[in-house]
Amino acid sequence: MMKKLLLLLICLATVIISGCGDKFAKEKEAISKAEKTAMSMEVPVLVKPDPSQQPPPAKEDYTRYQAGLNKLIAAENKMLVEMRKSDAQIATLLGKAEKEEEKKDLRQFRDKVRQDRISFVKKISQGRLSGDTFIVGVGSTWQEVEMVYGKPESTGNQFPGTKQYVYKGLKFEDIIGGGVPSPERLKKWVSRTVQSVTMTGKNVTSDAGVTIGMTRDQVYKVLKAKYVKKNSRLTTNELKAERTNKSDGFDAVTQFAMEETAPYNLFLEFKKGKLFRYIVAQN
């Protein structure tokens, strides 16, 4: 009897010391369930046609891709509604948290939610991205960018025919193509995917391993390590680059691809021999 009473007192003391368990357990469980439900929605598996391949993709390949992209974006819009709710709920819980331990636990929970989203986006992005990437990149939908990085800090200085999502150290962008667009075409234009990414912050590392502040030799070392020749028109397996070798200047790497991505161009701006701006863009 005394042994049972002692065990009961020990358990009671443990509960008191630990603050009676997780204060926000129910809320976190509900958020996790909503996130899981959102990411279990059916999405089409897309493979973006690669014009550098031989023979080049047929018109039907592009038509099929565009139709699938429409379905994907529709599903992702529904997911984002739930994810934005989750973000708002987590922010509310952080505002209610009184103890530092509670805040720390909620931040860890928020990071776990983001990591789950990143894993999901990586899975559904396979076969659609080009060049160097930043988890998301050229070929990603705007919805996927927000899933990974959250709502943009700003949308840049947009004008008709452009779209930008700006984050600390990163800018995702799309610009209408096909020459000078007519007013009618500008009015109807809707951006669906990212076409270029610019990295300027030291807080970011590309998936190839490039960071701002690297020397020219460091940049090319990591790019060569990740480069995979995928353009059948290229006659060599070597990384194709136009280097200025000037302390201040631009370099261009053409048809850069990794194991997971299709060929795309890279533009490197150096100042005082260090990488200052890194752009993934078609031209």
Segments from the language model and where they lie:
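Generic N-terminal leader/processing signal
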Residues: 1-2, 21, 26, 97, ...
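Sec-dependent signal peptide recognition
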Residues: 3-9
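Repetitive helical segments and hydrophobic/amphipathic motifs
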Residues: 12-13
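Short helix/turn-capping signatures at newly exposed starts of structured segments
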Residues: 20-29, 33-38, 46, 74, ...
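Amphipathic, non-membrane alpha-helical rod segments
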Residues: 43-101
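Repeat-blade elements of multi-bladed beta-propeller folds
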Residues: 247-254
